[in-house]
Amino acid sequence: MDMKLEVVILPVADVDRAKVFYESLGWRLDADFVGVGAFRVVQLTPPGSACSIIFGSGLTSSPPGSYDGLQLVVDDIEATRTELIERGVDVSEVFHDAGGVFHHAGHEARAAGPAHQSYGSFASFSDPDGNEWYLQEITTRLPGR
């Protein structure tokens, strides 16, 4: 049985500010629906992704900016980092985990520079609310992925 991740709900404080930010990343605006009362749903999709994000009003009880560890897979982390910086995003330097497996929480065990292996290099940025995203470079997928 296939199960595919379709959407991630992000907690944000200011829907319009978040919409401007994610559109500035080059993400496709799929919907901006205003419902009854204060209910609103905005959906955007990163380039090449089958999974979208949604945020709005009345969607989640999670506090704005509370998500950490959202992953965006890229095939060239340096080029993606440069493009995001050119779009006005504050992106960390490229790093890898000193333990060589996966990045630790926060900034612990960050080693400077790329790992020069698929799955091993990361960079991070946050949206205006503080939801933290990670770029992860994958050049060759593991079998079955």
Q: Language-model features: where?
A:
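Vicinal oxygen chelate
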Residues: 32-33, 42, 72, 81-145
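Core segments of cupin and vicinal oxygen chelate
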Residues: 2-3, 9-51, 79, 86
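Short, solvent-exposed coil/turn segments
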Residues: 3-5, 37-39, 48, 63-67, ...
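Residue-level recognition of conserved beta-strand positions in structured domain cores
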Residues: 46, 55-57, 137
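N-terminal beta-strand motif that seeds the catalytic metal site of vicinal oxygen chelate
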Residues: 1-17, 68-70, 136-145
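Acidic active-site catalytic centers that drive phospho-/nucleotidyl reactions
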Residues: 14, 76, 127-129
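Helix-adjacent hinge/juxtasegments
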Residues: 57-85
